[in-house]
């Protein structure tokens, strides 16, 4: 069997819509908090810690849960499963909320989320991704850099599977795009064009 680094699934989340593999999964016109709760409930899982997460971690959790819904126990070594994520605003959304909270009483619950890579920890714990775990701050979604970095890890047999993409939220404006990358036969090839097409198809 000829295996290639391929895009198995993709998820796109905007302010009111979630797309899974290009198909509309959820549409709800409501405020962000209500939208995230509806999305979580649609997953039909019980994970109480979700309610304590900041918005960026909730977005990453929901997107990765959809990607992994049929792959919760994969055949891959947990130490060869990785996360490579980008965004533009780091954890500024939560930083601003924490800054507002310390005008009164500082919120420890918010403080623990004032690093952008905390979302990776939430995703890694849920899906046992114990390999490469990297968060890049970029001007915008950069398919070329995602592919360049991830391809090296696959070529060197450091990873067998990865969740990669972009998790951006600022002032309640959401732009999330994640893909599950695996060694597969006859799947969508892991190319800049394919990744950019998937990202832009639901803009």
For the regions a protein language model found, what residue spans apply to each?
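Conserved "HGTGT" condensation-loop signature of ketosynthase/thiolase-family condensing enzymes
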Residues: 1-159, 163-203
């Amino acid at each position: 069997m000829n295996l290639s680094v391929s895009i198995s699934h993709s998820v796109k989340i905007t302010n009111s819509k979630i797309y899974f593999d290009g198909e509309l999964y959820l549409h709800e016109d409501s405020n962000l908090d209500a939208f995230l709760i509806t999305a979580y409930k649609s997953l039909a899982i019980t994970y109480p810690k979700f309610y304590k997460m900041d918005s960026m971690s909730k977005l990453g959790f929901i997107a990765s849960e959809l990607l992994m819904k049929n792959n919760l126990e994969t055949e891959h070594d947990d130490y060869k499963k990785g996360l490579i994520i980008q965004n533009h605003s780091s954890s500024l959304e939560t930083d601003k909320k924490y800054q507002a909270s310390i005008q009164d009483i500082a919120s420890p619950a918010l403080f623990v989320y004032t690093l952008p890579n905390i979302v990776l920890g939430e995703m890694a714990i849920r899906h046992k991704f114990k390999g490469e775990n990297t968060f890049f701050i970029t001007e915008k979604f950069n398919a070329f850099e995602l592919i360049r970095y991830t391809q090296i890890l696959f070529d060197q047999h450091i990873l067998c599977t990865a969740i990669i993409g972009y998790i951006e939220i600022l002032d309640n404006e959401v732009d999330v795009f994640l893909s599950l990358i695996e060694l597969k036969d006859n799947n969508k090839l892991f190319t800049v064009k394919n990744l950019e097409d998937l990202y832009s198809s639901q803009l």
